[in-house]
Amino acid sequence: MEQQKIPQATAKRLPLYYRFIQNLSLSGKQRVSSAELSEAVKVDSATIRRDFSYFGALGKKGYGYNVNYLLSFFRETLDQDDITRVALIGVGNLGTAFLHYNFTKNNNTKIEMAFDVSEEKVGTEIGGIPVYHLDELEERLSTDIQVAILTVPATVAQSVADRLAETNVHGILNFTPARLNVSESIRIHHIDLAVELQTLVYFLKNYPQ
């Protein structure tokens, strides 16, 4: 996607389109219109058409989009045939939930190992995923693991991120409230659940539907 120079906002919507198109294909549907896509993914039709236009002619006016063609296109664009191996750091309540879930709907994304400092958890398996001591982080992280999920206490998030920066990890999904400072070679996505909830409550009160 980087080579095609598409806007980041468009890139963020591609997995959303792909998931819906997967469901359409499984249901046996052969074609879909931008209006149908819009209703399903809650993105306006004009935005969908503009997003798709960055990749050339994906559909035909008056016909819509061929579902199997879109499925094949997005699978290749999103590298769905390549396995993304992930490490999780912090096996608290949220981390444990991730280990049990382990992206079961995304066959190309797998948490392969987890790290914690709790003696009760180190040396065990949760959801079939081995849990190692945090002291083993650099030793255990192989060159195959390029993404880390951070679910540690905010007070230690930066120090863990600093250690990850010394490995082959290039992407961090940060679920802590801490705003991390790392080199530009590492991409961080921050997801603060408390902030998301506060934002939702604000919109419910001030922008009623």
Swiss-Prot record:
<dbReference type="InterPro" id="IPR036390">
    <property type="entry name" value="WH_DNA-bd_sf"/>
</dbReference>
<dbReference type="GO" id="GO:0003700">
    <property type="term" value="F:DNA-binding transcription factor activity"/>
</dbReference>
<keyword id="KW-0804">Transcription</keyword>
<dbReference type="GO" id="GO:0045892">
    <property type="term" value="P:negative regulation of DNA-templated transcription"/>
</dbReference>
<dbReference type="InterPro" id="IPR003781">
    <property type="entry name" value="CoA-bd"/>
</dbReference>
<protein>
    <recommendedName>
        <fullName>Redox-sensing transcriptional repressor Rex</fullName>
    </recommendedName>
</protein>
<feature type="binding site">
    <location>
        <begin position="90"/>
        <end position="95"/>
    </location>
    <ligand>
        <name>NAD(+)</name>
    </ligand>
</feature>
<dbReference type="InterPro" id="IPR036388">
    <property type="entry name" value="WH-like_DNA-bd_sf"/>
</dbReference>
<keyword id="KW-0805">Transcription regulation</keyword>
<keyword id="KW-0238">DNA-binding</keyword>
<dbReference type="GO" id="GO:0003677">
    <property type="term" value="F:DNA binding"/>
</dbReference>
<dbReference type="GO" id="GO:0051775">
    <property type="term" value="P:response to redox state"/>
</dbReference>
<keyword id="KW-0520">NAD</keyword>
<dbReference type="Pfam" id="PF02629">
    <property type="entry name" value="CoA_binding"/>
</dbReference>
<comment type="similarity">
    <text>Belongs to the transcriptional regulatory Rex family.</text>
</comment>
<keyword id="KW-0678">Repressor</keyword>
<comment type="function">
    <text>Modulates transcription in response to changes in cellular NADH/NAD(+) redox state.</text>
</comment>
<dbReference type="GO" id="GO:0005737">
    <property type="term" value="C:cytoplasm"/>
</dbReference>
<dbReference type="InterPro" id="IPR009718">
    <property type="entry name" value="Rex_DNA-bd_C_dom"/>
</dbReference>
<comment type="subunit">
    <text>Homodimer.</text>
</comment>
<feature type="DNA-binding region" description="H-T-H motif">
    <location>
        <begin position="16"/>
        <end position="55"/>
    </location>
</feature>
<dbReference type="InterPro" id="IPR036291">
    <property type="entry name" value="NAD(P)-bd_dom_sf"/>
</dbReference>
<keyword id="KW-0963">Cytoplasm</keyword>
<dbReference type="InterPro" id="IPR022876">
    <property type="entry name" value="Tscrpt_rep_Rex"/>
</dbReference>
<dbReference type="Pfam" id="PF06971">
    <property type="entry name" value="Put_DNA-bind_N"/>
</dbReference>
